A protein has these predicted regions:
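Conserved functional micro-motifs across diverse proteins
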Residues: 20-215
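Bacterial N-terminal signal peptides
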Residues: 6-14
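Positively charged n-region of N-terminal signal peptides that target proteins for export
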Residues: 1-5
C-alpha cells in the first residue's frame, strides 16, 4: 500500500470514527449525549427547567488525556438552524443576575433539577464538581436572592483546570428568553477539540411521532 493510500485510508477512518463518536443514553428519564476526543470525554443533558431567562445544560467533562486542560462555560455555544449563535455565559454573570433578581423559587428549581440529573446518572463521578462546591455554598445567607446566587455558584460550571484523571461537572446557562434551546447544534470548544452535538426540538419530535401514528 502506498503512503498516499495509507494517508487517505487513515483520514477516512478518522472521519468515520468521529461521525460515530456520539453516544446516546438515558438515565432517570433524562437523555444524555457523550463524546470522547483526544482522551477527553464530554457528556451533557438538557435540564427540563429554566431559571429566569436561561436555558440550562448540565455538562460533565472527564480528562482521560495525558496533559492538563482548562475548561470554562464560555467554551460552550449553541447554533440555531438559521446560524445564529447563543453564547453560554460566565458563571459570574449568572450569579450577579440572580443576586439582582433571584428568589426562593429559583433556588428550589435550580437545586431540584440539577441534583436529580446528577445523582441519578451513575456515569458522572466528578473530582472537582458540584458535590465539592456545594459544601460551602449553602450557608444561612438570609436573603433569598443571595441563596439563589449561592445555588448558582455551586451548580454552575466554573473555569477549572483538569489534570489527567480529573473531572468536573456543572450547569451551563444560555440566555434564551427562558425558552428551551430547541433544534440546532451544541458546540463545545474544549481541550483543543471541537465537540458538535446535533439537537432536536423535543416537542417537535413528539408531535411528528404523534402525526406519524395517525392512520
Amino acid at each position: 500500500m502506498t503512503i498516499l493510500r495509507t494517508l487517505v485510508l487513515t483520514a477516512v477512518l478518522s472521519i468515520a470514527g468521529r461521525a460515530q463518536a456520539i453516544i446516546d443514553f438515558e438515565s432517570a428519564g433524562l437523555k444524555y449525549k457523550a463524546m470522547t476526543l483526544g482522551g477527553v470525554t464530554v457528556m451533557f443533558s438538557l435540564l427540563p427547567t429554566h431559571i429566569r431567562d436561561y436555558a440550562i445544560v448540565q455538562v460533565a467533562i472527564s480528562n482521560g488525556s495525558s496533559i492538563s486542560w482548562t475548561v470554562k462555560p464560555e467554551d460552550c455555544s449553541f447554533e440555531k438552524p438559521d446560524g445564529q449563535m447563543v453564547q453560554a455565559l460566565p458563571a459570574r454573570t449568572v450569579v450577579n443576575t440572580l443576586i439582582d433578581k433571584g428568589g426562593r423559587g429559583d433556588v428550589i428549581k435550580l437545586i431540584a433539577a440539577y441534583e436529580a440529573s446528577l445523582f441519578n446518572n451513575a456515569q458522572i463521578h466528578s473530582t472537582n464538581g458540584y458535590e465539592s462546591r456545594r459544601q460551602n455554598a449553602f450557608a444561612d445567607l438570609g436573603s433569598s436572592k443571595l441563596k439563589a446566587a449561592a445555588a448558582a455558584s455551586a451548580i454552575a460550571l466554573v473555569t477549572t483546570k483538569l489534570a489527567p484523571g480529573q473531572s468536573t461537572d456543572g450547569a451551563v446557562f444560555y440566555p434564551n428568553q427562558g425558552k428551551p434551546l430547541g433544534t440546532g447544534k451544541l458546540i463545545l470548544n474544549m481541550a483543543g477539540e471541537t465537540y458538535v452535538f446535533p439537537l432536536e426540538d423535543a416537542a417537535a419530535v413528539k408531535l411528528e411521532h404523534e402525526h406519524a401514528r395517525v392512520p
